[in-house]
Regions:
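Positively charged, small/polar-rich N-terminal and surface patches that mediate targeting and assembly
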Residues: 1-94
Length: 94
């Protein structure tokens, strides 16, 4: 059913040197809260920032457009997630 589809959330991890610009744009354009995680590359040990955001399935295409507008080579990892807790309720679809 369409309502089931709209309610499905996706967790997205994004790795890019342009993490500041991307995270600000995701907040402004998608209206979603963004978390910056601190990571380390296993091979070289380089410190890296990872953007973590939860969006609906219907927002994935827009998210990719925003990210690739800043960094075409950004690593984007997407997976299904069940979300509970304050601030992660259903969002109106326009």
């Amino acid at each position: 059913a369409l309502m089931d589809y709209i309610g499905e959330f996706q967790k997205v991890n994004i790795i890019s040197g342009k993490y500041k610009e991307i995270s600000e744009a995701l907040t402004d354009r998608l209206g979603r809260g963004v978390t910056i995680l601190y990571g380390e590359g296993a091979y070289k040990g380089n410190e890296t920032k990872v953007i973590y955001v939860v969006v609906s399935r219907l927002e994935i295409a827009k998210l990719k457009g925003v990210v690739h507008g800043f960094d075409e080579n950004a690593l984007i990892s997407i997976g299904s997630v069940e979300v509970t807790g304050k601030g992660h309720g259903k969002k109106a679809i326009h």
